Amino acid sequence: MGEVQREKVAVIIGPTAVGKTKLSIDLAKALNGEIISGDSMQIYRTMDIGTAKVTKEEMDGIPHYMVDIKNPEESFSVAEFQERVRKHIREITERGKLPIIVGGTGLYIQSVLFDYQFTDDAGDAIYREQMEKLALERGVEYVHKKLQEVDPESAERIHANNVRRVIRALEIFHTTGEKMSDQLEKQENELLYDVSLIGLTMDREMLYDRINLRVDIMMDQGLLEEVEGLYNRGIRDCQSIQAIGYKEIYDYFEDRVSLEEAVSQLKTNSRRYAKRQLTWFRNKMDVTWFDVTDGEKTSEILRYIEGKLQLKSNNSK
């Protein structure tokens, strides 16, 4: 018997503000595709401006999945993301369409494409509570430092402010004696799909200028009011609020910083995040990069995907 044909998937990754959204919609139109968000924060309802969520107008009739599926107070795991996205890939393929994953959350996207296994082990609730208490009493940096001591690779990948993931990585080491990063490395080798994985990059100074401008536009669009709505609903200490764009403005509402300082910190954190994204993608995934410093490369990228996945676009003769 011949080899089972794997489902075709196009993936667009890259740092924040590089232009992934517009490209994905152009490609979906040309390739008869439907889009799956690979962003761990666009899943949350009412968190639109700070996550740079694709608007109905931008979607231009192209179906989008993994957007607005959770309330801000709900938690969400990479295992749940993996399960839901694989189901969407199957269903989109069955409809004769091309699944296009677009986003910047590297671990989430990687968990879908490769043969990652997530255990159903509930972990150690007592240990978890101890770590949560430590984070409250000694600060998140203290707990992050503990992770650096036992699993430096995960500590590098997981930001100190992402307390839940820091504690989860510590919990895995505590319960299994294995580093989370080692568990993932062991499962990283085999692609489950026929994948065209492309990345967008650009001159760093230009990217940073775009990020700064994007933050200014977000403020003009009403980011302050969006975050105030969440704050007034009593949403605290949730996974969603640890997102860049929300935690900084929360500091303002809690009188820890001025609004000017909050916006400045938001720009700094966004630039740092973009740098971490690029480092992660370059170290962890076999990406074909397209430099869009001098303008979009839609036609070139389209030709590349057609060749890699042996597709014909609507633009082809």
Swiss-Prot record:
Return the annotated site residues (Interaction with substrate tRNA): 105, 128
Q: Which Pfam families match?
A: IPPT
BP-aspect Gene Ontology terms: tRNA modification
* Enzyme nomenclature, EC number: 2.5.1.75
Cofactor(s) named in the record: Mg(2+)
Q: Where is this region: Interaction with substrate tRNA?
A: 39-42
Question: Which residues bind substrate per the record?
Answer: 16-21
Can you tell me which residues bind ATP?
14-21
Q: Does the keyword Membrane apply?
A: no
What InterPro entries does this protein map onto?
A: Dimethylallyltransferase (IPR039657), IPT (IPR018022), P-loop_NTPase (IPR027417)
Q: Which GO terms describe its molecular function?
A: ATP binding; tRNA dimethylallyltransferase activity
Q: Which HAMAP family match?
A: IPP_trans (MF_00185)
Subunit structure, per the record? Monomer.
> NCBIfam families, alphabetically?
miaA
Query: PANTHER family, alphabetically?
Result: TRNA DIMETHYLALLYLTRANSFERASE
- The family this protein is said to belong to: Belongs to the IPP transferase family.
The function of this protein is: Catalyzes the transfer of a dimethylallyl group onto the adenine at position 37 in tRNAs that read codons beginning with uridine, leading to the formation of N6-(dimethylallyl)adenosine (i(6)A).
> This protein is called what?
tRNA dimethylallyltransferase
Organism of provenance? Bacillus cereus (strain Q1)
Q: What is the lineage of its organism?
A: Bacteria, Bacillati, Bacillota, Bacilli, Bacillales
